[in-house]
A protein has these predicted regions:
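Hydrophobic alpha-helical transmembrane bundles that constitute the permease/transmembrane domains
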Residues: 26-34, 67-74, 126-129, 133-145, ...
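ABC-type nucleotide-binding domain
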Residues: 327-582
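Membrane-integrated ABC transporters
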Residues: 1-32, 39, 47-62, 72, ...
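Transmembrane helices of ABC transporter permease
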Residues: 13, 17-30, 41, 65, ...
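Hydrophobic/aromatic residues in alpha-helical transmembrane segments
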Residues: 35, 39, 76, 80, ...
Length: 582
């Protein structure tokens, strides 16, 4: 319940709607509870005495009560809808804002599919609980209390008969709720698994088709889908037991009341109208119990979803800006001072160990190393995407932890290995680098990244619409747009994480020449090709998370065995500039 209370804090703007809705339900209930008394009087007085005017009068009163109940019910629906869906929107907004604050290490705690489920399905479960349960949870207790009170007012002896049945029904329903509660938690985890399989299958659909793995993916989906179906059936099997339990107790109570009431009528101790009105209250009280039981079932499932949502909201943000953090990076120097890093505190081995190096402002630095040598990990510490486990990273002479995160990351642009472009126009994507960039600045960056070569051939140019994942562009075109996006910004440091792997050597050479013209920008280039870094000011060789050697191309080629091996393997059949000999 603490999780639900936590989520209720997001209902603040809609508390007035909830209060109005609750009041309207109570008013509606009062009108409905007054009707059985009118029925009793109509039968015992009007019908028994043949008093037609009295029958008409009571009939009109019943109609007025029914109409008032209808009007208040309609008004309730208006306020309830606004409160329910507004509250859900606030929860989704809070989740999304929290996720935007996550560091990479926070995101490592959740699967992407799980986060999507928590923002959509779990919030919908909460909304369904409120939309389907708010009215019964308000109406049920009031019907129960007032119904029992009025039934005692009409006939205390009969009231004791069905009052004995009420605790029995409550006990049975509580057993069902306790049984179903853990099943709903398991059910939501199954939904996570299903969404994960669907997401992976759709994201990698081209690989699935290329390797003819359609049947394998279908089997994997069918397995998870079958597990979800089985869990749903088992949960539903227990959840629906509340209906037969309710009906069994209700019909037993009615039979007993008819038996005792019939005897009382025969003995002239009870009027027929009183018994009819009394049965109406019995039905209302039993229905109120059923309403409350259904609400508890809804609440049981929503509590599982609420816990999953609160896990997202209460995730401790690992990386935060310091109070009064430095808001400007004055120059692009980078220094690693005895830096070690591991992704998890409990990990036994470090991804980076005792890294010490200096990069001067305006320098161009290449980083080479084998697969798994932690090249990407190294550069991710510069914009503080992760914090070091030991040691200090400095940018512009200051510890990166002293900077305001937004200011630091504005000054350090990374072109990632994976080309990330969004649905929208080319212009909209490029303006991520600088939202105020003019078309002239955009085209200048495109020319530097050689993206103008294909944009000029597109009829709509910068207004060309990119499909989801930019699937209407080639790999090389995506890379060049990502490079252009980074160049549009006013970054002091540019980091290229193997960002020219999909372009040909001639295009890469043009891009390198354009970057060389940016004298005041520090360039760090992770590459697999020696030709991409051989003309840089210095080359850093990483081996198993450690700095093996730092030097220029000539120095490393002269006496470093690792560099010599990389160079020799890539330059067979080519000249020193990387051009293939024919």
């Amino acid at each position: 319940m603490n999780d639900m209370k936590r989520l209720l804090s997001y209902a603040g703007p809609y508390k007035r709607d909830m209060i109005f809705g609750a009041v309207l339900v109570l008013v509606e209930t009062c009108f409905e509870l007054f009707i059985p008394i009118l029925i009793s009087n109509l039968i015992d007085i009007g019908v028994a005495n043949g008093d037609i005017p009295y029958i008409y009068r009571k009939g009109i009163q019943m109609g007025v009560c029914a109409l008032c109940a209808l009007v208040t019910g309609i008004l309730y629906a208006h306020f309830a809808a606004r409160a329910t869906y507004g509250w859900g929107a606030e929860i989704r907004k809070a989740e999304y804002e929290k996720m935007q604050q996550y560091a990479f290490s926070n995101l490592d705690h959740f699967a992407v599919s799980s986060l999507i489920t928590r923002m959509t399905t779990d919030v919908t479960v909460i909304q369904n609980m409120v939309s389907a349960g708010f009215r019964p949870i308000t109406r049920g207790p009031s019907l129960l209390i007032m119904g029992i009170g009025l039934s005692f007012y009409m006939n205390p002896r009969l009231a004791f008969v069905f009052l004995v049945c009420t605790p029995l029904l409550g006990f049975i329903l509580s057993l069902i709720v306790r049984r179903v509660a853990p099943m709903y938690t398991k059910l939501q985890s199954m939904v996570d698994r299903l969404n994960n399989v669907v997401q992976e299958g759709l994201t990698a659909i081209r690989a699935v088709k290329a390797f003819v793995r359609d049947e394998y993916e279908e089997d994997k989906f069918n397995e998870v889908n079958t597990d979800l179906t089985a869990a749903s059936e088992q949960t539903f099997h227990y959840a629906v037991l509340n209906l037969p339990a309710f009906q069994g107790v209700m019909y037993t109570a009615i039979v007993l009341i008819l038996w005792f009431g019939g005897n009382m009528i025969l003995k002239k101790q009870l009027a027929v109208g009183n018994l009819t009105g009394f049965l109406s209250y019995v039905m209302q009280v039993m229905n109120s119990m059923m309403m409350i039981a259904n609400v508890f079932l809804l609440l049981t499932r929503s509590m599982a979803s609420a816990h999953r949502i609160v896990e997202v909201l209460d995730e401790k943000i690992v990386l935060t800006s310091p109070e009064n953090g430095v808001t400007e990076v004055t120059e692009g120097s980078v220094e690693f001072d005895n830096v070690s890093f591991k992704y998890k505190e409990e990990a036994k081995e470090y991804a980076l160990s005792d890294v010490t190096l200096k990069i001067k402002a305006g320098q161009t630095v290449g980083i080479l190393g084998g697969t798994g040598s932690s090249k990407t990990t190294l550069v991710q510490l510069i914009p503080r995407l992760y914090d070091t486990s030991r040691g200090t990273v400095r940018v512009g002479g200051k510890d990166v932890r002293a900077y305001d995160l937004a200011a630091l990351r504005d000054a350090v642009n990374i072109i990632l290995q994976k080309n990330v472009l969004f649905s929208g126009t080319v212009r909209e994507n490029l303006k991520w680098g600088n939202v105020d960039a003019s078309d002239e600045e955009i085209w200048e960056a495109c020319r530097a990244a050689c993206a103008d070569e294909f944009l000029n051939r597109m009829p709509d140019g910068l207004d060309t619409v990119l499909e989801q994942g930019a699937s209407n562009l080639s790999g090389g075109q995506k890379q060049r747009l990502c490079i252009a996006r980074a160049l549009i910004g006013k970054a002091k440091i540019l980091i290229f994480d193997d960002s020219t792997s999909a372009v040909d050597t001639a295009t890469e050479k043009k891009i390198r020449e354009a970057l060389a013209a940016r004298k005041n920008v520090t360039k760090t280039i992770i590459a697999q090709r020696v030709t991409s870094v051989m003309n840089t000011d210095q080359i850093i060789i990483l081996d198993d998370g450690k700095v093996h050697r730092i030097g220029t191309h000539a120095e490393l080629l002269a006496d470093d065995p690792i560099y010599q091996e990389i160079y020799a393997s890539q330059m067979k059949g080519g000249d020193e500039n990387g051009s293939e000999s024919l």
